[in-house]
Amino acid sequence: MIKLNLNNKIFLLVKICIIYLFISFESYADDLKNKKDMIVIGSHDALVKIKVFSSLTCPHCANFHIKVVPKIKKEYVESGKAQLIFIDFPLDQAAFNASKLLHCSDKNIQIKLLDRIYEKQNEWTVGADINEINNNLKKIVKNLGISSNHFDKCLIDETVSDKILNGRIDANKKYSISATPTIVINEKKLEGSANFKNIKKKIERLI
């Protein structure tokens, strides 16, 4: 058996601590980087983190965003108790294109753009083919200062595309997402309906 003297033991403990701190820092840095790529509302210090995985062409997701999100914002986000994190989980090409537009646009308008995409979902998602749907989407975001040229550039932005697709793959592996919207509160998938009553009950247990 190899016996360690006191100095060796101290050195080993210090080395382990340094490695642990380095790994923790890398994990923290990755978390910050990932959040920069997401659309986030609310304080980073909030006790409750609510992840919303959704597809921009999903009617249930639109209903959740229009009817439930404002209630969560008013009761928990504005008070600093909760943070909302919107994560794209596109289920079709039209949703993927809308996600690309969302994430390659200026951070300052992303929330407004997300609201508009959901509010006008019934208008822009109807079309004979993807080109018509893209043109519909261009029309409904025009008054937010988004040009046709900017839209076209977003569609061919491989960096943005890869981030969205990799995020979708990672989310599916981590949370086994089978439908949208899927709500994850403090890293636990919400069971049951994604309605305000159910979410409120979960939040109240955590604050």
Language-model-detected regions and their locations in the chain:
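Extracytoplasmic thiol/disulfide redox context detector
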Residues: 2-92, 96, 138, 142, ...
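Cysteine-centric redox/oxidoreductase cores and disulfide-bonded domains
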Residues: 90-179, 184-197, 201-207
